[in-house]
Each structure stands twice: as structure tokens, then as C-alpha cells.
UniProtKB/Swiss-Prot annotation:
Position of the signal peptide: none
Organism: Periplaneta americana
Protein name: Pyrokinin-4
PTM sites of type Leucine amide: L12
Family from the record: Belongs to the pyrokinin family.
A single cellular component GO annotation: extracellular region
Source organism, top-level taxon: Eukaryota
Keywords: Amidation, Neuropeptide, Secreted
Keyword NADP carried by entry: no
An annotated GO BP: neuropeptide signaling pathway
Tissue: Corpora cardiaca.
Compartments in which it is found: Secreted
Biological role stated in the UniProt entry: Mediates visceral muscle contractile activity (myotropic activity).
Main subcellular location of this protein, as a coarse class: secreted
Length: 12
């Protein structure tokens, strides 16, 4: 179970 990458490291 893992959250979308944008949750803890948003794409700039």
C-alpha cells in the first residue's frame, strides 16, 4: 500500500 508520489513529493 503506497500513496501517490505527489503526496509526499509533489511534482514541480
Amino acid at each position: 500500500d503506497h500513496l501517490p508520489h505527489d503526496v509526499y513529493s509533489p511534482r514541480l
